[in-house]
Every structure is written in C-alpha cells, then in structure tokens.
C-alpha cells in the first residue's frame, strides 16, 4: 500500500469512527480556546492577504456547497426532501449519505438511489458561495484543491484550474478496480433517471457495468465508492 493509499484509508476510518459527531454538526477536533479577531478585522486581514498574494491556493470543501443549499448529505433537510423524498418515505433513512449506506433489497433499487444521488449533483446550478469566491479571485493567479465531488468547481472554472483529489460525480470506475480507466457517468445516470420515472428502481439492462470484466461500476470517488458495492450489497444469508 502506498503512502497515499494508507493516508486515504486512515482518513476514511477516522471519518467513520466520528460520523455521528460530524452528522450532528460537531467536530472530533479539539478546538483552540484562543479568542478570534473581531469579524470585521478578520475580513480586513483576509482582503489584505488576497491583495498581496502572487498566487492563491484555494482549499474548497463541503461547507461551500452546504452554504449554497446543498445541505442534504447528513440530515433530513428541506433540500434532502426535495431531491430524495421518495426514497426517504419508502426506506426511512435521513440524509443522502445514509442512503448510500442503506442495504437495498435489490441492485435495481440500489442503482435507482445512486442515479438519483449523482443526478442531483451533476445537474445542480452553480451555488452562490462559488460565485462569491469567483469574485474574490478575479484578476488573481490561482488553483483550486478540493475534496468535493459534486462538480461545482468544474462548472465555473477550466478543469486545469481544479484538482479534485477525492473524485468527480461525472465518472464511473470499475467496482473491482480491474484497471484504472474511468467512464462517463452523466449519460448513464440520465438514462436511469428517465427509466425510473416516479419509481425507485432501474431496469437490469441499465445497471452500469465495466466493459472489461463485467463487474458493476461505482462512482469515481474516494470513500463511500467502495461502500456502494460492499456495504449496500443485499444480505445473502
């Protein structure tokens, strides 16, 4: 296992260990007791540093999307009900990530949910915090380093400006990792959504499969990607 793979595995285990804390809006990190600067002074300091910088490295994470209305991942919010309501009503989970961990009875239901999840982020408009950030970066040399997989940054910037270090919802990969190739997920997701209609299942023939080994695909993401196959797989005992 490479150093990077080891780091990813440890990060995922730590995230899983503290999932309930994060889901409730808390943190497992011991926060500093040092009093922050008054808010206006923080803004002034931020502006000064942006103006003086020759190049800016932007670290963008899930808070940007959540602040712009993409707050459906962890709890039963209005946006979760808007996009995932039929699944929440039928299966009882609350929060989009809980749906990713749900043990659906069939692969058809499983992929109905995965398609809905990916369709939600693939087709979301550019959220306001990203537009605010873009205004801040005007005229500056910059690069984006993001853990987000929801395609918001690549909707507003050229791909060479963005490093998506945890994957991208526009692509699939082989669930068995038979090779490193990735495939388009946008059209397959659109086809599954159209076929599913108001239901929660997709037909067998639309379940995406690796053209090399025939295994099911899963989204090209770090973390819950493996759980889509191994955790959500129906119980066989």
Task: Describe each model-derived feature in a short phrase.
Residues 2-236:
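Conserved catalytic core of sirtuin-type NAD+-dependent deacylases
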């Amino acid at each position: 296992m490479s150093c990077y793979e080891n780091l990813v595995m440890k990060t995922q285990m730590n995230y899983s260990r503290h999932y309930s804390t994060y889901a409730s809006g808390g943190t497992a990190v011991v926060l500093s007791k040092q009093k922050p600067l008054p808010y206006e002074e923080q803004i002034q300091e931020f502006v000064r540093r942006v103006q003086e910088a020759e190049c800016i490295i932007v670290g963008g994470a899930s808070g940007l999307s959540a602040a712009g209305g993409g707050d459906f991942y962890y709890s039963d919010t209005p946006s979760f009900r808007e996009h995932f309501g039929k699944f929440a009503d039928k299966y009882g989970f609350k929060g989009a990530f809980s749906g990713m961990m749900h043990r659906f009875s069939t692969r058809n239901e499983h992929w109905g949910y995965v398609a809905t999840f990916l369709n939600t982020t693939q087709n979301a408009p550019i959220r306001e915090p990203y537009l605010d950030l873009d205004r801040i970066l005007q005229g500056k040399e910059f690069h984006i380093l993001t853990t987000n997989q929801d395609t918001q940054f690549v909707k507003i910037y050229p791909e060479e400006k963005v490093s998506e270090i945890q994957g991208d919802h526009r692509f699939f990969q082989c669930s068995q990792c038979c090779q490193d190739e990735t495939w388009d997920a946008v059209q397959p997701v659109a086809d599954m959504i159209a076929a599913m209609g108001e239901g929660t299942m997709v037909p067998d023939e639309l379940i995406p499969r690796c053209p090399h080994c025939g295994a099911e695909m899963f989204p090209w993401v770090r973390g819950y990607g493996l759980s889509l196959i191994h955790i959500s797989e129906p119980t066989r005992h």
